[in-house]
Amino acid sequence: MEGNGCGGSGATPRGVVGMHWAPVVTSPPSPQPPFLPPAPCRPDVQMQQQGGLTCLKLGKRPCFWGGDGAGQVAQGSGGGGGGGGGGSADQGKRKEKAATAVPVVPRCQVEGCDITLQGVKEYHRRHKVCEVHAKAPRVVVHGTEQRFCQQCSRFHVLAEFDDAKKSCRRRLAGHNERRRRSNASEAMARGSAHPHGMPVLGHGFPPYGLPTSSAGALSLLSSARATGPWLMPTPDISARSSAALDELIAENRAALLSWQFFSDRQPPPAGRPTGRSPGSETAGGWHAHLQARPPPPGAGGQHENQSGHVTLDLMQATTAAGGSGAPFRPVPARPPKEGGDAGCTSDAWTPSPMEGARVV
């Protein structure tokens, strides 16, 4: 027992020394890391994993990018390499299938028509109908008699068409309604263009001899109003009527003078008034006014303005048209207007009260 104890006691310090050997050593122990670093990952795998987080890859398995352990990352990288090989193989198979696939050629959908639509228009290719059956009044599609509507670009049953129309009833009704609406708006616009809402007569031209508007008549003597707006805004209807009558009288006198100029001093046909006496042939007409000396101030006739243009004054004294008709007397000149008629005399010639009104 003692020997054993001695032996034990002798072995005890040795064992104690052996148990306390590590702290007694003077050399410092090597520091142990708190955790193992993750396994190094290849740069290409790391780029693929980062790309999987920032982009959409539909139809592919996403990468496992987590911080749970390095083993999963390593397994994911290994599996990614295998998956990359499988993906490239799948892509190669898809390319082979696409190369070997025959393109579908569009054909006419009418039963019994096997015409390919390769060299036809894009319209017929898109709607799968040939040009002949697109205009046919009756075809068989899906076992039913139908007709191709040109506005809907599709086939309808025959009950949706009126007689031999190429468009269905619904589209034709909408088209007619739009046309009616546009015609009504145009008519309203034409009516609103007139001061009193009077519609345009005939084909847009007034009857011969009537003024072109209720506000006044177009004058042949006023060149400024011929190029610009010539409507005369007047307060009442009586003033407008007087202005229109003045314009018509002036136009009639201008026509008479032009006829005298082109008559070339020939005797007129029987029954046609000449508007001048037999002895006034040399005095009347335009030849008497083509003189180098300008007429005296206040006398009617032809005068030359500063620009060199020759102007015929129609309100001259009745030297040419005073033989057979009633004597006319000029009305006092009206004040100049704002429209540019400065310097023009009155366009009206009124008969004397003893002779009465007489308009040629």
From Swiss-Prot:
Trans-acting factor that binds specifically to the consensus nucleotide sequence 5'-TNCGTACAA-3'. May be involved in panicle development. It comes from Oryza sativa subsp. japonica (Rice). Zn(2+) 2 binds at residues 149, 152, 156, 168. Its main location: nucleus. Residues 172-182 have a biased composition (Basic residues). This is Squamosa promoter-binding-like protein 7. Gene3D superfamilies: Transcription factor, SBP-box domain. The keyword GTP-binding does not apply. Residues 74-98, 172-196, 261-306, 318-360 are annotated as: Disordered.
